[in-house]
């Protein structure tokens, strides 16, 4: 049986690390990408004991040539999980252009690379509950209207619909999963919930 190969963008994050661990247990070859400024920030992978089991590649989602290089190098990729983003809402207000270039157009660049190099690749886009913005409904689902309230949320809406468009227009297996806040021991200490729990531990 052929060993499957998966690319995970944003491998150094909470979700990237747990997903890598899960796929490795299923005997996948895992290629993890991260931006140059995150190089060496692999403490989550070390904590899970998988740091040396992953093929690492630097890849800036703002650069077409870097994305194309990865797809040219790894010709037998089966799945791509796009978890990378400029994911801080406050930062997105300070740097809306950079946020859009990475979070919105980065998704488009990956999907275009899949269209150009290998349309058999299955693509997963990590969408965000931030797309809903301020809503009146108690619960949200796929039919809840989007009301993005930040450059980050707007970028995620763009990525969400771009994924849908590539699925319908180019017959690519491209899906989105809408993620709400979720916690774990690998959650970054810069997030509010982690600050609260760390503060409670010190009491």
Language model features: what each stretch is:
Residues 1-184:
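N-terminal Rossmann-like NAD(P)+-binding domain of SDR-like oxidoreductases, especially those catalyzing
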Residues 157, 182-198:
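Glycine/proline-rich active-site loop of Rossmann-fold NAD(P)-dependent oxidoreductases
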Residues 168, 194-203:
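Alpha-helical substrate-binding/gating segment
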